Amino acid sequence: MRLSEFTTLFLLFSVLLLSASAEQCGSQAGGALCASGLCCSKFGWCGNTNEYCGPGNCQSQCPGGPGPSGDLGGVISNSMFDQMLNHRNDNACQGKNNFYSYNAFVTAAGSFPGFGTTGDITARKREIAAFLAQTSHETTGGWPTAPDGPYAWGYCFLREQGSPGDYCTPSSQWPCAPGRKYFGRGPIQISHNYNYGPCGRAIGVDLLNNPDLVATDPVISFKSAIWFWMTPQSPKPSCHDVITGRWQPSGADQAANRVPGFGVITNIINGGLECGHGSDSRVQDRIGFYRRYCGILGVSPGENLDCGNQRSFGNGLLVDIM
């Protein structure tokens, strides 16, 4: 064999060897997914054994989570989730011991087609950033001079702080159970019997009789928040439809300055208290979380982040714990 032919074969073999050794999936491979239903390990390799799929070893396409067509691993990895919520397991937080885990989040998301999987990669990343930002504000344990800044302390609390009431509104459709209280719980701090009832029905759990499941079962906890996010409550659109660009404001919305963007989501969640009166520290806190999370995911936050000049849709359905 001539020297030139040997050199060519050697170079070809080297290229193939390097290609074979490159990471295959997840954050190490630009969000790529594994084929044939394989798990993506925390190191970026595809496989089907415990080293790839086991708790703590799997970053995406994990057992119990959504499949390749609806997987969140291409949008947010376990390590990104931990970076965003890096103080959620602080000793001062109710959610310590990893209650709000990545696996619980991904598992819950699998029950809601379209969540974090609608549109192009920019739209998907913005939805995850917006969801985690709004829920981080609702559960934050941060303060202005907190270590790593105020926007690193989301998902600290499980239950509404202080001495909340029972949040029971007389209802024949969603009757309050004796001795049960419907104060804020979980990532979105869902409150009131008229929210616990339909949420429980949607996710297949009796939350009217067992409201504290939202603060004791991690998957149910995330499901309660994603249910609220995905569900329109007239005249409000769903948060999902707003952030993915599916919502088109009506004439009444435009007259109220309610235009597509993160600000309308704040209006949906707690506009009766936070929107329509100029600058509000709670709104700015939500925006601060959103900007930070968009930065981690490598996407711009878009426009219309504030709701200071928007008229509210009506009274907020949730309790604000700030």
UniProtKB/Swiss-Prot annotation:
GO biological process: cell wall macromolecule catabolic process; chitin catabolic process; defense response; polysaccharide catabolic process
Protein modification: The 4-hydroxyproline residues are not glycosylated in this plant vacuolar protein.
Predominant location: other
GO molecular function terms attached to this record: chitin binding; chitinase activity; endochitinase activity
Disulphide bonds in the chain: C25-C40, C34-C46, C39-C53, C58-C62, C93-C156, C168-C176, C275-C307
InterPro entries: Chitin-bd_1, Chitin-binding_1_CS, Endochitinase-like_sf, Glyco_hydro_19, Glyco_hydro_19_cat, Lysozyme-like_dom_sf
Signal peptide: 1-22
Cell compartment(s), UniProt: Vacuole; Secreted, Cell wall
One GO term describing the cellular component: vacuole
Recorded catalytic activity of this chain's protein: Random endo-hydrolysis of N-acetyl-beta-D-glucosaminide (1->4)-beta-linkages in chitin and chitodextrins
Top-level class of the enzyme under EC nomenclature: hydrolase
SMART domains: ChtBD1
EC number(s) per entry: 3.2.1.14
Highest taxon of source: Eukaryota
Matching Gene3D superfamilies: 1.10.530.10, Endochitinase, domain 2, Endochitinase-like
PTM annotation (4-hydroxyproline): residues: P66, P68
Cross-referenced Pfam families: Chitin_bind_1, Glyco_hydro_19
Summary of the function given for this chain in its UniProt record: Defense against chitin-containing fungal pathogens.
Family to which this protein belongs: Belongs to the glycosyl hydrolase 19 family. Chitinase class I subfamily.
Protein name in UniProt: Basic 30 kDa endochitinase
Organism: Solanum lycopersicum
